[in-house]
């Protein structure tokens, strides 16, 4: 008797592994977004402490450009809003992947439970 798993079980295992990889990628993406959000919020906090006529600069690629406080505050707040939206999107993706993972895990358990025992 062959020790190989049936094609259906192999397929389910491959799908589980793929979902695990997707979940790990989402965790990394979520961490990166959270970090960017914290940086933007910290910049907003520092700008709030500054007088309105303060000279500020912002990074644009390899350049630092002069800007005014109000414009920079608006840009930073929009960035935080966008990052919040991205975090919500990632959270929904995580939920879908987790749900699919649990469903597939149950199917796999059922498939393995129906396999004939290996005898010797």
From Swiss-Prot:
One of its GO terms (cellular component) is cytoplasm. Molecular chaperone capable of stabilizing a range of proteins. Seems to fulfill an ATP-independent, HSP70-like function in archaeal de novo protein folding. Belongs to the prefoldin subunit beta family. SUPFAM superfamilies: Prefoldin. The keyword Flavoprotein does not apply. Heterohexamer of two alpha and four beta subunits. The keyword Cytoplasm applies. This is Prefoldin subunit beta. Keywords: Chaperone, Cytoplasm. Its main location: cytoplasm. It is found in: Cytoplasm. It comes from the Archaea. Coiled coil: none annotated. GO terms for biological process: chaperone-mediated protein complex assembly; protein folding. One of its GO terms (molecular function) is protein-folding chaperone binding.
